[in-house]
Amino acid sequence: MSHGFLLHICVGAQFAGYEVNVSQVQVEINATPTVNSQPFRAADFATLTEALDYAAKGATGSNFYTGRGAIYASLTYGELREQALELSHKLLGLGLNRGDRVALVAETNPEFIRFFYACQYAGLIPVALPASVKVGAHAAYVAQLKQLLQASDAVAGVASEGYLPFLQEASEDLSMRMVDVPEAFHALPGDEQPLHQARPEDISYIQYTSGSTRFPRGVVIKHHTAMANLQAIIADGLKMNGKDRMMSWLPFYHDMGLVGFVLVPMCAQVSIDYLDTREFAMRPRQWLNLMTQTRATISFAPSFGYDLCARRVRPK
């Protein structure tokens, strides 16, 4: 997997005047358990939707932490499936057709995962866009988004309030059906038409390369390709079992983050704990703290992450 994203990690909370909101913990939230009630299966499914249908029967899921190590959101796979199914009808209510591309600014939060799987159930194709703006690089980031929107032929776009102005500016001259925040899509009326049953030969998502040496190249991933890769990672590469727990700070728009820490845990029915990439860059110790706190058994990163810990983390 390419490691080009490491050159673009941002540690600021404001870019070109747009504030990227940081979630605050208001109520006590319990993390999903490590022990699952469902028998472990090593991604022996035909499609991602079949994998989520199975994972949803257990109690495991995804958890999201602030830079201070406090959990601010938790989403079981059962809740994810239910919410993704509901959202899939709302996306189809826009008049989107099977095979249409939906651009998702891939921040490390539950909304990206909800929309990614909603697209799977609706027969739409999610395209993960980078959520990474270097300070003073407003124009360059907008240009990058515009090129990705054009290259992917996206018909709708989703971004948080912090990133929406960039995405709207990038889509100004494009014929897109809707570009808005997640809440606006959730508020749409649903379409009650039967959902498309995903087939192994259907396109699941489009993954763009890092583009560290040239403009990012889109790779079309079909369900059968994704599942073969995931099964190899889970069964042969990581040799996972039902007692594992994962932890990651890698961005969702990067292949190692999307495949390794969004798709793998769900297809293995294990819980995962997330720390935002920006928060890791500011507080690398938190990666180590959270692995200890959650008793994670699996976490990996490019060499940059270990180097940052070695340089910035000092014994207490």
What are these regions (language model features)?
Residues 6, 10-15, 93, 121-189, ...:
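Structural core segment of the AMP-binding/adenylate-forming
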Residues 63-117, 134-141, 192-198, 221-224:
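Conserved AMP-binding/adenylate-forming core of the ANL superfamily
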Residues 109-134, 144-156, 244-245, 263-273, ...:
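A short helix-loop-beta submotif of the ANL/AMP-binding
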Residues 228-245, 255-297, 308, 312-314:
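Conserved AMP-binding/adenylation subdomain of ANL enzymes
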